[in-house]
C-alpha cells in the first residue's frame, strides 16, 4: 500500500489505470482472496472499505500508544468509512466514548441505528475544543481538518483518511506546540485485508444490513444523490442487471 508505483483500477494516482467499471479485468492471482464460506458474495464488496477503516483504526491505536477502549474518539463523516470506523471501534476495539459527526440528518439517522455511539451534527456543543484523544477525518475537507485540530487534545492523534479537498489552511502552530500526531492513511496491507475477511465472516461488525443495493442502470442517480447530500445510506452497491 506504500508502493510508489501502486496501481488501482479506476484511480489515476500514482499511476493512471482506468477500468473500475469494466465487465472483465485481469489482475495477478496473488491479489485474489478466496471468499470465506460465511460471507455472502453480495456483502463481500464491503471488505475493501472495511480494510481501509481497520488499517486507519490500528494506525491510530499504535500512534496513541494506549488501548482505544480508554480514549475519547471523534469520527468526522458518516459515510461507509466513517461508519465502519465506528463499528470497528465499538465492536472490535470495545471503545465506549465515540462521537460520529455528519451534517446530513438522514445519514446520521442511518448511522445511529447501527451504532451505540452519539451521532451529532457539526455544530453540537458536545464537540468540544481540545477534548478528543483521537480523531478520524473520513471526509478530508479544509473545514474538517480545521475542526480536527481544534477538537484534538494536546498530545492527541489525527488520522486523515478523506480526500475531498487536497489542500487548505491548517493550524500548524497548535500541531507543533501541543505535539499533535497527524497521520495520512490510504488503503491497507495484506494482513489488514485477511483480518477484515475474518471479522466479516464471523459477523464481528454486525449484520451489515445498512448496505443498500441498486441496479447498475441506477448508478448515475445514486452518484448524484451522494454528491447532492440527499442519500441516507452510507454504502450503495450496484448489481448488474
Describe the role of every protein-language-model region.
Residues 39-122:
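Mid-domain Rossmann-like dinucleotide-binding core that forms the NAD(H)/NADP(H) cofactor-binding site
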Residues 143-202, 239-241:
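Glycine-rich phosphate-binding loop and adjacent beta-alpha segment
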Residues 1-32:
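Glycine-rich phosphate/adenylate-binding loop and adjacent beta-alpha elements
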Residues 75, 136-137, 160:
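Redox-cofactor binding/interface segments in oxidoreductases and associated redox assembly factors
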Residues 126-135:
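A short acidic, Gly/Pro-enriched loop at the edge of an enzyme's catalytic core
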Residues 146, 190, 194-241:
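C-terminal hydrophobic helical "lid"/dimerization subdomain
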Residues 117-124, 213-218:
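Short acidic-hydrophobic, aromatic-tinged amphipathic segments that line or gate anion-handling sites
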Residues 22, 70, 131-132:
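Local beta-strand N-terminus motif with an aromatic residue
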Amino acid at each position: 500500500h506504500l508502493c510508489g508505483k501502486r496501481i488501482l483500477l479506476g484511480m489515476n494516482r500514482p499511476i493512471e489505470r482506468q477500468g473500475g467499471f469494466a465487465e472483465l479485468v485481469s489482475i495477478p492471482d496473488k491479489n485474489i482472496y478466496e471468499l470465506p464460506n460465511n460471507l455472502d458474495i453480495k456483502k463481500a464488496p464491503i471488505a475493501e472499505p472495511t480494510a481501509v477503516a481497520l488499517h486507519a483504526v490500528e494506525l491510530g491505536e499504535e500512534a496513541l500508544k494506549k488501548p482505544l477502549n480508554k480514549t475519547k474518539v471523534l469520527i468526522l463523516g458518516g459515510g461507509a468509512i466513517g461508519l465502519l470506523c465506528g463499528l470497528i471501534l465499538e465492536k472490535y476495539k470495545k471503545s465506549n466514548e465515540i462521537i460520529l459527526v455528519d451534517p446530513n440528518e438522514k445519514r446520521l439517522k442511518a448511522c445511529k441505528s447501527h451504532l451505540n455511539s452519539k451521532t451529532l451534527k457539526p455544530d453540537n456543543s458536545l464537540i468540544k475544543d481540545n477534548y478528543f484523544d483521537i480523531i478520524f477525518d473520513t471526509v478530508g475537507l479544509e473545514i474538517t481538518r480545521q475542526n480536527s485540530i481544534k477538537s484534538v487534545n494536546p498530545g492527541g492523534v489525527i488520522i486523515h483518511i478523506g480526500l475531498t479537498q487536497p489542500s487548505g489552511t491548517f493550524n500548524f502552530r497548535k500541531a507543533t506546540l501541543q505535539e499533535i500526531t497527524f497521520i495520512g492513511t490510504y488503503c491497507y496491507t495484506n494482513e489488514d485485508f485477511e483480518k477484515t475477511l475474518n471479522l466479516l465472516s464471523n459477523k464481528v461488525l454486525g449484520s451489515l444490513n445498512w448496505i443498500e443495493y441498486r441496479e447498475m442502470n441506477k448508478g448515475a442517480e445514486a452518484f448524484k444523490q451522494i454528491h447532492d447530500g440527499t442519500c441516507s445510506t452510507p454504502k450503495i452497491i450496484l448489481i448488474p442487471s
